[in-house]
Design a protein with these regions (language model features):
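Extracytoplasmic "Venus flytrap"
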Residues: 24-44, 48-49, 57-71, 88-92, ...
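Hinge/cleft segment of the Venus flytrap/periplasmic-binding protein
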Residues: 168, 285-355
Length: 355
């Protein structure tokens, strides 16, 4: 009996130890707690953490960098520090957080907006910061895809004719917005018949884009195409066009990034001609990397420490309808590299949710 009791105690202790040793993660979410993209991003991240046995806490900054830094200070300098801190280099905030992290013992993973080349040069100054890597989506390709697909939807342009384009970028100090702009300009270089009449920074905000578009559409009434770096700005610009008595998808063709219910509905009813999405999954895939790193996997050997994932894809009507419905559950544990051969590469893709 004593042996049985001792065995039970040992088993219970082992189970408790496994729970106690579950890697803890804090995610510094740069968005608002009411912002569809960042909420869905965190939800997918939580699903990954739950499946992988990670303890994840999400801290929303409500689009305020000072709040982000306060949350970082609490996580890195307070009691009960996490094993990992996941952050976004929104408005170039990463170096300040890396400075705080020196000597904390907390490992950092950067997602969505990686370090800029200038910031990367500062890494040697943070020699005691445990940065395990970064993972971003192919934002430049997203910007490129939007314009090239808009032109495909528009159809042939008569010889000697031109098309006027209006563009809404995000925030000047957000690397993802800059990269999407670069993709736009690459597409423009390939299609000189398209004239970019004006590019403005809508700060990812619907109301701001609505106000900007109201003036831009008056200034450039012949505009045929609108390129938008996210869904909120596209919806604001669409409303401005509708208020002028014109019809989105007929009089002017719109494009957008993201997969919120409202923008998916616009894709389904034809108001939106081109939609690119997929990067809301980044946080979930980051959980797989953290799980594996905590298990001793050299994640750098499986695609590099700083990885760019080809996550963006054009969302056709059938796919938009699929994304509007209940999402297919993802077996995150099956994506882990634990126990896989050295040749294994993470198959991160939106297709895991669509098939």
């Amino acid at each position: 009996m004593l042996k049985v009791l001792m065995a039970c105690v040992w088993l219970l202790g082992s189970a408790y130890g496994a729970i106690a040793q579950a890697a803890s993660v804090v995610f510094l979410n740069p968005g608002r707690s009411s912002e569809t993209f960042w909420v869905s991003y965190a939800q997918f991240m939580q699903a990954g953490a739950k499946d992988l046995g990670l303890d994840l806490r999400v801290r929303y900054s409500e689009r305020d960098n000072q709040v982000t830094l306060a949350h970082a200070r609490e996580a890195l300098l307070g009691t009960g520090r996490p094993d990992y801190l996941v952050l976004v280099n929104e408005q170039y905030v990463a170096p300040q957080i890396m400075r705080m992290a020196q000597g904390s013992g907390v490992k950092l993973l950067i997602v969505n907006n990686a370090l800029t080349p200038d910031q990367t040069q500062l890494l040697d100054a943070y020699h005691d910061t445990r940065l395990i890597g970064s993972m971003v989506a192919d934002d430049e390709q997203a910007g490129y895809l939007m314009l090239t697909d808009l032109l495909r939807q528009h159809g042939p342009i008569a010889s000697g004719a031109t098309l006027d384009l209006l563009a809404f970028s995000g925030a000047k100090t957000t690397p993802a917005a800059q990269l999407r702009e670069q993709g736009l300009r690459r597409a423009l270089a390939e299609h000189p018949q398209v004239r970019l009449r004006q590019l403005v920074y809508g700060e990812w905000n619907r109301q701001r884009a609505y106000e900007q578009a109201t003036q831009m559409l008056k200034r450039y009434p012949q505009s045929a195409l609108v390129w938008s770096a996210n869904d909120e700005m596209a919806l604001g610009a669409m409303q401005a066009l509708q208020d002028s008595g014109r019809v989105p998808g007929k009089d002017v063709l719109f494009s957008a990034v993201n997969s919120s219910p409202q923008i998916l509905a616009a894709r389904l009813d034809g108001r939106l001609s081109t939609l690119v999405a997929g990067h809301f999954t980044l946080g979930g895939w980051a959980m797989v990397l953290i799980h594996d790193e905590a298990k001793g996997v050299d994640i750098g050997a499986l695609g590099g420490r700083n990885r760019q994932q080809a996550l963006f894809q054009l969302i056709e009507v059938a796919q938009a309808r699929r994304l509007m419905g209940p999402m297919r559950s993802v077996e995150f544990r099956a994506l882990s590299a634990v126990g896989k051969p050295p040749s294994y590469r993470y198959p991160f893709s939106l297709q895991l949710l669509l098939r």
